[in-house]
From Swiss-Prot:
Source organism (scientific name): Drosophila melanogaster
Keyword Transmembrane helix: yes
Record's protein name: Nicastrin
Location of this chain's protein in the cell: Membrane
UniProt lineage: Eukaryota, Metazoa, Ecdysozoa, Arthropoda, Hexapoda
Keyword field contains Metal-binding: no
Length: 695
């Protein structure tokens, strides 16, 4: 009977303990409520650290809503219960306001929340006025005049993307979450400010601790030292993949058992930027800052493929390259130039001969097309080639046959836009590099708000065949003023000019780029990767995500989905159909099996491949990190990003709790001392039978 009672007591104790734990978890869940969002994070270069970080255990601040600029004065002039977490709408997220909060220091400001209230927003760009200003033609001077809005490439830039903040900045896009934060502020914080220190307040905790500090040189040294001992990393180089393809398949490097470099092989190099960036992790589509140029680039490639004969020994080849990491001092193009100098592009694994600078006739770099109807042709020097290409472009742009009604102007000077061509001109100012760029009109350059709305994109979703070229007078599916038609017009003009350059004959046909492909392309990259164009360029039955691909360069092991989709896309659009090859035999590259527009599957001979987009600075032993020769950007490692709101006890409550705890601790020590010193009196000796029973 006694044993049963003991067993029952043990089970009761276990159940009571379990109930206590369960109750504790429910209480915790009621105390904290998670808030979804995106965090600012830390990046470093050879001389500085930029971005944000929380404290190791997380940064906590009392919520305070900023409706007008004057509301900041409360936080900056002896607030009653610091630290605070201001909730700032985009139109007040300015350089002046953020630098004032930074100067207030972590004593008063511990967190900044950017809330998605855009009704008063007119601009939002936190890139520099001169992007990549120290990595252009001459690393010791700026590539544009940052002090003169008429002479810089981002007049609305605040430079906050390149500042270092002593507190985390957290972006909250979901309006339901924003409403929840505002309600919590109104219910608990927005009254009786003089008594803030005496009562519980609604607060937020943000965890976004960054491991890296100081600069890339220090961080890489610490990382390499720790790795030698088997530890973890503090930072990683920004690293990705360039994607390239040729118009025609190339001859193999080995002929008759001899390795040959084809010095008579000539290319026109057509390039664009693949990546974009923002202040916040995983947010930012780069619709106007780079996607417009990428769209024109893709359509030029496809139109040339359709207009030119499938094989020709006499015609120039065209090398199409999308560079990754250009937002960070031209990582992709710097590595491309470095590899070409060393005759390491393409790699030996491709089985094709290396391409040298002597193989390149000229480069046409498609830059930022903010105003896609107002484009300039830029060149460092006014060469005969530049004048010739300009005349050909305008010949088609102004031709009544096509009705494009565009006028492409030119500028031949060192005032060049921040595009990949600068990496080539930096090596050799006499290199034949031409740049197509529009005047800057993007008020959301490198920001979270450079999205489909910023370029006025509306998906037509026609379900028609986008792989066929269209007649120039076909306006059935899309409005002539639509973005898709503007992409059609510009890409057709460029492709026609290149067609004439390659063949030596003027283009007289009526076929132009298909605006429906532009419709699908923009939908894939701005709204959903689960789209007809990506499906056609993938293996049959591939499962695609319903989110647009991330185009930030990231690090080794990070997301490279934009490079992957670009690889498939260029492979599909520049390939040659092989109708006689069955699916089972279409397995070894360069053969590739695609779903195709009808999703029935088709074997194609492809020319696309990857090249490494990692700065040469990380390959050179003893590199001088402050030299400015190559990009030195790295990204800090972190463990987690999270945010949650809760009621923070008042200062008086915290002091009272601490005091009670200290008193209880002292009393406990006293009781233990008394019991220990009087143990002979308080505890009698056990009877012999009990002593034997309990050992």
């Amino acid at each position: 009977m006694e044993m049963r009672l003991n067993a029952a007591s043990i089970w009761l104790l276990i159940l009571s303990y379990g109930a206590t734990i369960a109750q504790g978890e429910r209480t915790r869940d009621k105390m904290y409520e998670p808030i979804g969002g995106a965090s600012c994070f830390r990046r470093l270069n050879g001389t500085h650290q930029t971005g944000c970080s929380s404290t190791y255990s997380g940064s906590v601040g009392v919520l305070h809503l900023i409706n007008v600029e004057a509301d900041l004065e409360f936080l900056l002039s002896s607030p009653p219960s610091p630290p605070y977490a201001p909730m700032i709408p985009p139109h007040l997220f300015t350089r002046n306001n953020l630098m004032r909060l930074k100067e207030a220091g972590p004593k008063n400001i511990s967190v900044v929340l950017l809330i998605n209230r855009t009704n008063q927003m007119k601009q939002f760009s936190h890139e520099l006025n001169c992007p990549n200003q120290y990595s252009g033609l001459n690393s010791t001077s700026e590539t544009c005049d940052a002090s003169n809005p008429a002479k810089n490439w981002n007049p609305w830039g605040t430079g906050l993307l390149h500042e270092d903040f002593p507190f985390p900045i957290y972006y909250i896009a979901d309006l339901d979450q924003v409403t929840k934060l505002e309600k919590c502020f109104q219910d608990f914080n927005n009254h009786n400010y003089e008594t803030h220190a005496l009562r519980s307040l609604c607060a937020v905790e943000v965890k976004s601790f960054m491991s890296a500090a100081v600069n890339t040189e220090v961080c890489m040294r610490r990382t390499n030292f720790i790795n030698n001992l088997g530890g973890s990393k503090y930072c990683d180089p920004l690293e990705g993949r360039n994607v390239y393809a040729t118009l025609y398949p190339r001859k193999p490097a080995i002929e008759n058992n001899l390795e040959t470099v084809h010095t008579n092989e000539k290319f026109i190099l057509v390039t664009c930027r693949l990546d974009t960036t923002t202040m916040f992790d995983g947010v930012g589509l780069g619709a106007m800052d780079s996607l417009m140029g990428f769209a024109v680039f893709t359509h030029v490639a496809y139109l040339l493929k359709q207009l030119l004969p499938p094989q020709s020994k006499d015609l120039h080849n065209v090398l199409f390259v999308t560079f990754n990491g250009e937002s960070y001092d031209y990582i992709g193009s710097q590595r491309f130039v470095y590899d070409m100098e060393k005759l390491q592009f393409p790699t030996e694994s491709t089985g094709t001969p290396p391409i040298a600078f002597d193989n390149i006739d000229f480069m046409l770099d498609i830059g930022t097309l903010d105003d896609i109807s107002n484009i300039k042709l830029h060149a460092l020097n006014g060469t005969t080639l530049a004048q010739q290409i300009l005349e050909r472009l305008n010949n088609y742009a102004k031709s009544p046959r096509y009705g494009f009604n565009l006028n492409i102007q030119s500028e031949m000077s060192a005032h060049l836009p921040p595009t990949s061509a600068q990496s080539f001109l930096r090596r050799d100012p006499n290199f034949n590099a031409l740049i197509l760029n529009a005047r800057p009109t993007n008020k959301y350059y490198h920001s979270i708000y450079d999205d489909a709305d910023n370029v006025d994109f509306t998906y037509a979703n026609t379900s028609k065949d986008f792989t066929q070229l269209t007649e120039v007078n076909d306006f059935k599916s899309l409005n002539p003023d639509s973005l898709q038609m503007k992409v059609r017009n510009v890409s057709s003009i460029v492709a026609m000019a290149l067609y004439q350059t390659i063949t030596g004959k003027e283009y007289t046909g009526t076929k132009v780029a298909n605006p429906l492909m532009a419709d699908e392309f923009l939908y894939c990259f701005l709204q959903s990767a689960d789209c007809p164009l990506f499906k056609a360029a993938s293996y049959p039955g591939s499962q695609l995500t319903n989110l647009p691909p991330m185009r930030y360069i990231s690090v080794l092991g990070g997301s490279q989905e934009s490079s992957g989709y670009t690889y498939r896309l260029l492979g599909y659009l520049l390939s040659q159909l092989q109708p006689d090859i069955h699916r089972d035999n279409c397995t070894d590259l360069p053969l590739h099996y695609f779903a195709g527009f009808n999703n029935i599957g088709e074997c194609r001979l492809t020319t696309q491949n990857y090249s490494h987009a990692l700065s040469p600075a990380f390959l050179i032993d003893g590199y001088d990190w402050s030299s400015g020769m190559y990009s030195t950007w790295t990204e800090s490692t972190w463990s987690q990003f999270s945010a949650r709101i809760f009621l923070r006890p008042s200062n008086v409550h915290q002091v009272t709790t601490l005091s009670v705890g200290i008193v209880v601790l002292i009393i406990s020590f006293c009781l233990v001392y008394i019991i220990s010193s009087r143990s002979e009196v308080l505890f009698e000796d056990l009877p012999a039978s009990n002593a034997a029973l309990f050992g």
